[in-house]
Amino acid sequence: MVVLLYLCGLLAAAQLGKLSALAPLIASSLGLSLPVVAIAISLIEVGGATLGAVAGLLAHKLGLRRTLYGGVACLALAGLGGAWAQGVTGLFGWRLLEAVGYLGVIVSAPVLIAHHAEAFGARVQGLALTLWSTFVPAGLALGAWASAGMAAAWGWRGAMTAGGIVAVALWGVLWRAHLPDHAEAPTATRRATAKLAPAMWCLALGFGAFALFEIGALALLPTLLVREVGLSAQAAGQWTAVASVSGIAGSALAAWLLRHGASVRWPVMASLGLPPLLLFGVFTTAPQAHVAIGLAVLLNMLGGVFASLAFALLPRLASEPGQMVRANGMLAQCGASGSLLGPPIMAACVQAGGWTAAAVFGLIASLAALPLAWHAASHRANRLALDAS
């Protein structure tokens, strides 16, 4: 069950990498400028950045299973329809439908995972959510790689059609799996609309600040490797993919900590505080290739630790029945907001003050997030020295 729900996350995150890989072909075929295609790429985060918390409440009212089915169906329809886009209107329209599908999956699947794993104890639940936290780097890399490969054989329209067919197949598997809906009692429904604990707000805001510099740095890494290191665009893209996927190794480390019942307060602080310091070794004038790439990989590995522990904290900060959906929606909204704003803000820093200015911004964002993360990790219900229950 957890694996099937994780595959839904991979499918959703693959849409993040799909359009990036197909952007040059789409721009050439439809006669669009690359900035216009770049806007289409970013549209998938708009829904999460503006409606994440609201979507969490709607998912609670509609039912998690129904929300997940609808999300995967939107991804399938958008993939098949987008393959027939004839201009900017069609491209944007199908991408917005894709954003709806993406949002439906990310607000429902992790909550279903948490509900399913809860029966096996808090430690297993934390490990399951740690697995879920890898869906973005893994799905993004998979989407970019698969789309590029299929486009080489069948063109960008063929690649998008194939992606839509995969989504249809996954929807069919979901339908036959008969997922439990985990319907809540009326009391739990009322509690879902109650105020979230301050520690949950701290976790969500800290996660947003983390995404601000983490995604911003990853987005600018190819440009730095081309302009300052002298790599080709293809090599820069490949090393950026390696850096992104290294977050999965960080998630494995987080899983090891959870499995051994370690307190996560200091791992949370270290994995949030060290990456912006490493960024000063990456975002500099004419860095050595092996130094910049090595530090970027380490930076994203540590980021994977923080992201995984943040998801593992969710069920302990949203301990009231019914609040898990809303808490997950809030975390998704803050993370999407940071992902949406981080690249343009850090690019503006580079333009105004050079690469070091972007590293300074990353440090400021991290300093703002540290006390928030400390409060969340120190909450009395969230010392993840988990027992065997």
Question: What would you call each of these model-derived segments?
Answer:
Residues 19-20, 198-251:
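Extracytoplasmic gate region of multi-pass secondary transporters
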Residues 316-355, 362:
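A late C-terminal transmembrane helix in Major Facilitator Superfamily
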Residues 264-313:
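C-terminal transmembrane helical hairpin of 12-TM major facilitator-type secondary transporters
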Residues 51-63, 250-263, 350:
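Helix-to-loop junctions at the C-terminal end of transmembrane segments
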Residues 94-136:
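Cytoplasmic helix-loop-helix junction between adjacent transmembrane helices
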Residues 78, 89-98, 290-299:
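Paired small-residue
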Residues 50-86:
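Conserved MFS/SLC helix-loop-helix module at the cytosolic interface between two early adjacent transmembrane helices
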Residues 124-179:
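Helix-loop-helix hairpin linking two adjacent transmembrane segments in secondary transporters
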